[in-house]
A protein has these predicted regions:
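N-terminal pre-triad scaffold of radical SAM enzymes
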Residues: 6-59, 76-85
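Auxiliary Fe-S-binding modules of radical SAM enzymes
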Residues: 2-17, 210, 222-295
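Short gly/ser/thr-rich secondary-structure transition/capping motifs
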Residues: 4-6, 72, 159-163
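N-terminal-biased segments
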Residues: 15-17, 24, 41-42, 46-47, ...
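Conserved AdoMet/S-adenosylmethionine-binding subsite of the radical SAM
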Residues: 108-262
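Iron-sulfur cluster-binding cysteine motifs and their immediate structural context
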Residues: 33-40, 59-78, 88-104
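Hydrophobic packing within well-folded, soluble alpha/beta domains
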Residues: 32, 54, 60, 64, ...
Length: 295
């Protein structure tokens, strides 16, 4: 069994407690307008080309089996329609202008890499977080990986948007120590506007995980143009959870514009950023509902 991995991030400190390694699986069931990891949306391998970093060395041209790269009068050009997704060019790029997202790996190939930092996990109270995209789109792989991690005494976290079936959740719940769960909106119309999908199953799954007595850290991407008026509703919802450990309010940023360009993807990022006052108000609103830890 294999999965398509978009990235591995060692020494991560924002994807759960302690020092962690975060495994980013490719493919997502939502399409959030503010997505800051567009390389994780699609399920197929993708090559990112950062033209401003290219030094026109020509290494990719000589190696590319499909002729997708060319050096001409106006420098390096890349024809994405010819790319077969092998990623070989990114391995020889001298200017770091090419980044390949989508390495195919088995659990047995991935596990030793994750165990390399076991000492750091143990001393910091960390572990391994499986994320995406939406990692549970590759649930069988996740379940096998999480099981192997638990067999090796590693703390596990699943970072999910929750837009999956309950049967899918059941595959990973036994091997997951904590869920990092995104809540973007309670109002379904708002959620559809934000993500392209309804949220009925997402809210149902949140309550289901809680009923399984699994710790839940809720993450709220705070995007003023879209969900500023949802904070009270979210607070009411979270107040009903028995296993909520903390809530993180994640202020929207628009740093990912260059990623969209490098992948030839439409940039849907909103223009308006949250100011300090609106962010503070959101946090204080959530605290009104008796939530002990809001960050």
């Amino acid at each position: 069994m294999h999965a398509i991995i978009s990235d591995l991030k060692r020494f991560a400190v924002h994807d759960g407690d302690g020092i962690r390694t975060t495994v980013f699986l490719k493919g997502c069931s939502l399409k959030c307008v503010w997505c800051h990891n567009p390389e994780g949306i699609g399920f197929k391998p993708q090559l990112a080309f950062y033209k401003d970093k290219c030094i026109d060395c020509g290494e990719c041209v000589s190696l590319c089996p499909s002729g997708a790269h060319k050096i001409g009068e106006h420098g390096h050009s890349f024809d994405r329609s010819l790319c077969i997704g092998c990623g070989k060019c990114s391995e020889v790029c001298l200017g770091n202008a090419l980044t390949f997202y989508g390495k195919k790996m088995t659990v047995d190939e991935l596990l030793p890499l994750l165990l390399e930092d076991k000492e750091f996990y143990e001393t910091s109270g960390g572990g391994v977080t499986v994320s995406g995209g939406e990692c549970l789109c590759q649930a069988d792989f996740c379940a096998e990986l999480l099981k192997k991690l638990k067999e090796n005494g590693i703390h596990t976290a699943v970072d999910t948007c929750g837009f999956v079936s309950q049967n899918t959740l059941d595959k990973v719940i036994p091997y997951t120590d904590i869920f990092l769960y995104d809540v973007k909106a309670v109002d379904e119309a708002v959620h559809i506007k934000c993500t392209g999908q309804p949220n009925r199953q997402i809210l149902k799954n949140l309550k289901y995980i809680d009923s399984c007595n699994k710790p839940i850290e809720v993450r709220i991407p705070f995007v003023p143009e879209y969900n500023a008026n949802e904070i009270d509703k979210i607070g009411e919802l979270l107040a009903t959870l028995k296993n909520l450990t903390k809530v993180r309010v994640l202020p929207y940023h628009n740093y990912a514009g260059s990623k969209y360009k490098s992948l030839d993807m439409e940039n849907t990022l909103p223009e308006k950023l949250p100011d300090d006052e609106s962010l503070k108000n959101a946090i204080e609103t959530l605290k009104k509902y008796g939530i002990k830890e809001v960050i």
